[in-house]
From Swiss-Prot:
Gene that this sequence comes from: cmr2
Name of the protein in its database record: CRISPR system CMR subunit Cmr2
Cofactor: record remark: Binds 2 Ca(2+) per subunit. Binds 1 Zn(2+) ion per subunit.
Location in or out of the cell: Cytoplasm
GO molecular function terms noted in the UniProt entry: metal ion binding; nucleotide binding
Organism: Saccharolobus solfataricus (strain ATCC 35092 / DSM 1617 / JCM 11322 / P2) (Sulfolobus solfataricus)
Signal peptide: none
Function, as annotated: CRISPR (clustered regularly interspaced short palindromic repeat) is an adaptive immune system that provides protection against mobile genetic elements (viruses, transposable elements and conjugative plasmids). CRISPR clusters contain spacers, sequences complementary to antecedent mobile elements, and target invading nucleic acids. CRISPR clusters are transcribed and processed into CRISPR RNA (crRNA). The CMR complex degrades RNA complementary to the crRNA (target RNA) within UA dinucleotides, generating 3'-OH and 5'-phosphate ends.
Cofactor field: Ca(2+); Zn(2+)
Chain coiled-coil ranges: none
UniProt xrefs under NCBIfam families: cas_TM1794_Cmr2
Binding annotation for a divalent metal cation 2: D810
Amino acid sequence: MSTDDNSREEFLNYKIMALLHDPPNKAWVITSRAHNLTVQLRSVRARKSHERVAKYIINQLFGDINSKTVDNADKLASSIDRYLGSIVYKEYSLFRNRSIFLKNILLSNIQRDVGNLFPKDKSKLDNLISEYKKLLNVTNTTNLNILKYQLFYLIYELIWIDSRYENTPAETRNPTHTIFDHLYATAAMMNWIFSLEKEAKGYLLGIDTIGVADFISKGKKTRDLWISSYLVSALLWYVITWFIEEYGPDVILFPSLRFNQFYAFYLLEKLRKEKISEDVIDEIKELITKYIFNGDDLFEKLEIPPYPIIPGRITLILPGLIREGEEYTQVPDDNYFISKVKERYNEGWRKLIEGLKCYSELKREDGFWNLVCRVLKLTEDLLQTTPLNIRVKQVSVTKDEIFNNSKLRSDSWKIYDNKYRQLVSEFKKSKLVKVTPESRLKLFELTKFDKLPQIGEKSKRGYEFCTSCGVLPAVIIMPKEDEFEKKLIELGIARDEKDVRSIKNMISPGERLCPWCLVKRALGAEPRLMRILLLGDLCSVEKIVNEIVSKDVKIEIPSTSDIASIKTFEEMIEKKNEICEDLKEEEVCEKPNESMLSMWQRFNKNYYTGINLTIDPEEYWFSEKRRRYYFSLFRRHRITFPSPYYALVRADSDYLGDLLEGKLTPYLAGIIDSGDYANISEKKEEVNKLLEEYLVNAGSGPIVDYVKTVLECIRGNLNKCSCAVKIYSNEVAEVMFRANRLLRKKLEKIDVEREVENSLKYFRTILKEGRIIVTPAWHVSISSALNRGLLVELELINKHKGFVIYAGGDDLLAMLPVDEVLDFVKESRRAFAGVSTGRLGNMCLENGFARINNAYYPSLPIVGRSYSVIIAHYADPLFFVINDSYNLLEEGKEMIRYRVMYNGEYKDAKKDVAIFRYQGLTSVIPLSLKRPIVNSVSDFNEIASIIDLILELKKRIDEGHISVSLLYDYEEYKHLIVASDEKYLTEFLVKDWIKRNSLRKHVEFTIDEKLYGVRLTIENYPIKIPNDLISNIVYTLRIIYGGEK
């Protein structure tokens, strides 16, 4: 297939070659386990057996395409342990390993055996290829176009997984990342290689949304919080759709577009727009529903992905080229991409406002939408400004930084690492100055000269502050509850009683809203308008709005009182027949007469079960007027009267930013801190020990002894390493014995001593840096692991009846029933490390790996995760609850330290904690008591084990084996237990405390003695927390019971 040297088709050819340069079954081929297959493909011309298989797959799917530069992208994309291969075994087939293991890229001493589930002969490979062909050949062209590439990027590993094949390592000698992680990383690096070949620069570009937590917190209703989160995700998604269309999905490093719900949804919509066969669309929909949406087709019914999963930070790897027609030329200047990002961001917001205007105009018969339409017209100028700011930074790479003439420079393996750290540094500098979005509005002019439009009760002082954000002047001022309906009509806000009901349903009496907060409230009422951003440039605003108006679907978002009442709703559903006979309130048992969907999975599963889930608990059992009636009713039918409390859970991974820079802080959280890297030589002993263990364990087979020996020589400050020379010489001799004539000639030219010197230099460079040198493979592996972890997290939230407000990257904000929160924190923390009991969605988590069918992928076992849990009253102002949860987590995980076991002795550590709060009571539970958190498979059982203990104690209390007075009698024992330095005395006191409160003679409940000595210290923390672990365990249970009462 001939292509123009600068054409888009040639660029896509490069990327297809990158994705397919190694076959997914490479490990089996190079270890001679696919002998039948390679024999059957002997007519395919290639140097090596696995290249023969790869070439056959490429030819079958995309025709005869070729790219000589894939080797450079391959090398630059690889992880640091595979770079060792470029230095040690090169093209010599040295240190071959016929065993196939897959190791965790973050924790290389944890591994899985890889079995024999792969296409073993040509017929099975052809069957697999036909599955790809069936979906790829519907793009109405035989040539490779952007749609075909986007589709292949999506389905490549999904079809492999669906065929129930295993996932192999990219290299059997250093099996630390999967073949798919390697292939997708190579495709990403091809953006630089292609660009540099054309004498253009390559770029790393980052986008950071400023003040995400603050923006999300500015709301009075759950609907406001959820839509704020969705805006953060959707605006950035709109930005990156341009890059996906110009260059392909591989340019997005963070978040990965593999297993990504937004990307899967976008591509499905694009295929529909292209009028692809419905049968093919159904097959693709089945694949993504099964493996990307956890088997839930809510995204189809809602016509948007239900969860805001795009984080506030994006990283892209870009070629310095811009397309003109089907040809590429160099970007006009270095700021081109920065300007493009800002332009797209502002454009996305304005399109959204345009769509909201259009929709409200078409819905003016509804009182709320009529009000929205009026305000949008009056505040048109104000709404040209986005309510969020973004920072955009980039760094560039030139050809001479990577290449020396046409060959890779000897230090090219460090270039990506250098550029990424430069990008991080640029962001750190820019954070010194913060400009709020409000500062871009001309508020002084509006308020001073009475230009601010106001609808409703006019302010006597010129303006009133918005009650939702508390920052901007309000343009809607609702009358108070007294005579609300009458005043609404008199003030011209509503035309009749029907309008009043519509408005009151969305805006409460006494509420005041600024233009931005009204926009959020309106978008929360019709979230499908987010399609304007989600579809990028696929459809016009007018077409999207008309389609939405033509399909009238009501969308429910749960309130805090709904979350608090979930147990009561469930019990009412179980006893619906008897309770509906007794109920005076007919609407509670009304059957749904209209289509309704919710972002809350619990609602959708129970909508048609006989109890009206759309009723507002605040107007029924939480109402002062009806509370006594419902208390009596529920008691008669043995239904739990609901507690007015719910749990707000916030979670954030520890040191993820450091991990992406290759720093070792996640491995020794608190023992090594981020600030230590200003002078990391002071932590040389800990750092070198970790790095050496990682580098040794990253190998598999004969290479391990060689690496050990080289590191021993470095440790001994030896310039020469005779033992390593001997090992290397013996390996050369052994390979030469079985080598063909061509390989033997290469081996005869090897200067063994020089090769060993290169190895010494390589390892010294890494040890001097005191961190892992990051590569695209490192980033792609972590980014895709975060996506898989996110899918598990969403499944857990739904399992525990919660509602997701935000779930971008490693962050989570969710509401759960109080009685589910301990189980959720335990399971979530373990799942993040890669361990679970039972299946979660389509995944099983097994000792640091996620298994999807038979394919294993790495989880993030060495990364800690911290949680804040606020037990809040449904009527508490959400703004304060959200901010409290943020401050509690951000400050607590930095300031609270506790003792952990490291290398046989106790050290002070921090992070990886769960902080609980209810009213004035706060407790802290460490989620791990050693560093690294995981160092062997047995360590997985210890993660969140203290939460297990708390749950077991709660179970004994709930079952009546132990009295709840145990938690309050503790105060009599507390000072003795805390003051005791002798374990036997502490154990005696604890046993006596439990025995005194046991309701049965023999209650077997013990606390591991290692917990007695755990102490917490708090640095500059304004909140009082007990210093001993036993007190924190007791206080945590008090907090939970306080929320359940």
